[in-house]
Amino acid sequence: MIGWRYLTGAFFFLLVGAIAKPISAQTYQGRELVKAQLIADTDAIAAGKTFTAGLLLRMAPHWHTYWKFSGDAGLPSEIKWTLPSGWKAGEIQWPIPLRLKDPGDIETYGYENEVLLMQQITPPASLADSSFTLSADASWLVCERLCIPGSAKLQLELPIAVQTGPANEIRGRR
């Protein structure tokens, strides 16, 4: 049932992604190819409490990015976090990819439409500020008939609190 657990987590992040801003867009010849955005599964950061953050990439129709093992061609997307001392980022949790055919019958593995690359983030045991800005440099290779490298410097500001809740919790619901 790991598939359902992953899909449930991905759905949760997609709901959160509708709220999170800002979004960075990659354009080529006036056409928007990829929208990149950082999202998190929490409404606040608590000292020492691990949470999940992710890079959401939304590709234009017929364009794709690559999995960590891309196959005969391609490069995987990367996330380089800028975290202060004491913060830790886990490994990227790669969703199961699609098998794709690139021009020349080259077999690759990747993602069409959108992909969420999640990572566990652990803050230190004590936090002094009232908020924290997660910063990441993201890079990817997006392809259709040709491949174009893309990148973005992304940020997501979250408050620091003693207690946290899910980012998509509906408040005041009866």
Please give the residue ranges for each predicted region.
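N-terminal secretory signal peptides that target proteins for export/translocation
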Residues: M1-W4
